[in-house]
């Protein structure tokens, strides 16, 4: 796989040293929240100019600025309405309660921090709660803890994209932000939002064959939200048994490698038999749709987008390593199976399908041969406009509108947390 010039691992230091002023610009864009159309319009204008301008440092600067501004604006999106009013559910208030207890020094020891997290939100992943505890000690209100955690998750995703391709990173970033997943992750699924960012970084390291670092970051992701462990398990299975590049397990002469391939084929055969009946599949789909649950609808939306991403990759003959394609296929199969037989698990796993096809989109702009720069800019512009329309539709239909009048704090629910 061909990538642009690699970015150093200390990406945050590079951003601050070379583009420190852009962070300030992104912060300033979020100030006039009483007039939310202005900062959002300015951010989109910067991204459009970055697409249309010729190559050069100015284009890179605008791309970086628009990406950071998008992250910060979406950080403040949820606080612009009441948490429950915006369709985010009661879990958001449970997280706020945990942040409030952290700030009031109700818990001090590591064990107390975990107990507070489990009691408030029902999840005992230590990495997330220790991170939340550290952030809570730096700010006065649960609102700021919430916003900083969202910003951290967005910047982790952005860093992974920035390291993969520097020229069109903003296009892929906008495409990622335009889907329903990030809106959901910023609501009741704040733990998984941070985990998604860590998984993206782990996948980037895995692509670069930095296996030790990828494993370390992957463990951090699993410690942030347990559903990330399923993705790591699928990746490990593909790397150990199906990849041509990793150790003795991949050699045809290795009996363990052959056993691994046989095991994978057996699993696929069982899955094919289980899903071989059209009546069975249709009955499961109808049962899921008739449950009248808010999660089932967007779960199938993610499944459709995952299939479209696969078609997109094969249609344009994406130059991805074989193990990456197999990993994505096995993971989508796992998600489809769990969505039928274990809906509570499947709804969480499907969010990680974005990690794969964001990588597909990153590679897309550098893998296509025989195209002029103008053609690539045209494709980028079309993708950008499509993602903008999709974002407006999703937010307006499912989250009662993005553009609201008044300040950020004024729209929050009254209560002890604010």
From Swiss-Prot:
The keyword Transmembrane helix applies. Its main location: membrane. Keywords: Cell inner membrane, Cell membrane, Membrane, Polysaccharide transport, Sugar transport, Transmembrane, Transmembrane helix, Transport, Virulence. The keyword Metal-binding does not apply. It comes from the Bacteria. Signal peptide: none annotated. It is found in: Cell inner membrane. GO terms for biological process: polysaccharide transport. One of its GO terms (cellular component) is plasma membrane. It is a multi-pass membrane protein. InterPro entries: EpsG-like. The chain crosses the membrane at residues 21-41, 45-65, 142-162, 170-190, 222-242, 262-282, 296-316, 326-346, 347-367, 377-397. To S.marcescens SfuB. Probably involved in polymerization and/or export of exopolysaccharide EPS I which functions as a virulence factor. May play a role in export of EPS I or its intermediates across the membranes. This is EPS I polysaccharide export inner membrane protein EpsF. It comes from Ralstonia solanacearum (Pseudomonas solanacearum). The lineage of its organism: Bacteria, Pseudomonadati, Pseudomonadota, Betaproteobacteria, Burkholderiales. The gene is epsF.
